[in-house]
Structures are given as structure tokens and as C-alpha cells.
């Protein structure tokens, strides 16, 4: 069984563009304060002592990353990402060395709290399949009629969770599940869905709902608020 002293490698797929942000700059390179969103996301991972290395998968044509101080960080490895998220994660896993467990974290999710990360990492003591940070659905959920912006019915929210990141799995298991799912044409929306496809049932670790992913323009101000609040709390 895995123990807490095992080093962890994190993989950050950062090859996407994010057209919903309505900006020419990829969202991970937008700034909050004096750092990019990507830097906030990566530094939150490196703040935990078990995370010894972060592999960042960037677009082969990316000229922005090399301009960041992060590019010269001794714990950072950069690889070329792929067309899809799963391709980028696989590229990152190949560069993860002999790490037995890996975290996968969104490049545009800068508000990760250390207590959430610590509880997720504790799964290596109790689980053989790992798990994800997630938040219970609290809003009323509606399913739309096919092809229409009209309500078909209300979805029972009991047992529904919002999947967050990081997601935390044994490296070899995640590699094998992603490879099989891609080879068989399965729809993979996050890393956990690859394990689900292969018959595994990752754990849900309840995380904070303010661990948001910056996807739309209005998310940027919200992420800035959350980060500013966290910094203020840490300094008081």
C-alpha cells in the first residue's frame, strides 16, 4: 500500500486556447496580480512538500511560456502537448519519471487551497485507484430538450457532484486507462472518466467550491477576488 512519504509528480495540461474567454491570449496566460493564471495554478501545487515536480504540457507553437520566470524553475519540466487534453496528459505522464502517483491539475484553476490538496493526497494511504476533488451540486439542475433552449425536466441533484481538479491517481493506472479509452474511441472529459470507462470507481474528496476554473471573462474577476482573499487571510 502506498505511504505518505512517496513523492508525487503533477501534470498540468496547458496546450489549450479557451475561446470562451473572448481574448486573443490563451486564458492560462492572462494575469491576476503580478502572475499569470498558469503560475498561480502551478505554485499552488509546488507549495505542498510531496509535490516534487510539475510537468507542464504546452502547445508546440507556444512562445509565451518561455518568457515566464516559471520556465527556469528547477522543479518544472515542459513537454509538447497534443490536440486533446488526454493527449497532453499522456505526454506529461511519459515525462513523470518513476513517480508512483500523479496529480493532474487544470492550468486555468488558480484558486486551489492547500487543505483540499492535502486531503486529496492522503488517498495514497487508503486507495488503490485514487480520486478527485469535487463539490456537491447545490443548484437546481435542468435538462434541456434536445436541440432546444427549453426545459425537458428537472434533474435530481442528489448524488451529483461538480468534478474539480486536481485529480490524483497511480501513474501506471492512469496511463493504461487513458491509452485504452483513447484507442477505443471513448469520450474522455477528465482523467477520472478514463478510469470509469475501464471499470474503476475513483473516490470523491469534497473540495471548496471557490476552486474555480477560469473559463469565461467574468471568471477572471472572481478568481482575483478569491486569490486576494486567500492572501489576506494568510497574512493575518
Swiss-Prot record:
The keyword Cytoplasm does not apply. The record marks 157, 213 as: Positions MEP for the nucleophilic attack. Pathway: Isoprenoid biosynthesis; isopentenyl diphosphate biosynthesis via DXP pathway; isopentenyl diphosphate from 1-deoxy-D-xylulose 5-phosphate: step 2/6. Catalyzes the formation of 4-diphosphocytidyl-2-C-methyl-D-erythritol from CTP and 2-C-methyl-D-erythritol 4-phosphate (MEP). Its EC number is 2.7.7.60. Signal peptide: none annotated. Homodimer. Belongs to the IspD/TarI cytidylyltransferase family. IspD subfamily. PANTHER family: 2-C-METHYL-D-ERYTHRITOL 4-PHOSPHATE CYTIDYLYLTRANSFERASE, CHLOROPLASTIC. This is 2-C-methyl-D-erythritol 4-phosphate cytidylyltransferase. The record marks 20, 27 as: Transition state stabilizer. It catalyses: 2-C-methyl-D-erythritol 4-phosphate + CTP + H(+) = 4-CDP-2-C-methyl-D-erythritol + diphosphate. Coiled coil: none annotated. Keywords: Isoprene biosynthesis, Nucleotidyltransferase, Transferase. SUPFAM superfamilies: Nucleotide-diphospho-sugar transferases. It is an enzyme of class 2 (transferase). GO terms for molecular function: 2-C-methyl-D-erythritol 4-phosphate cytidylyltransferase activity.
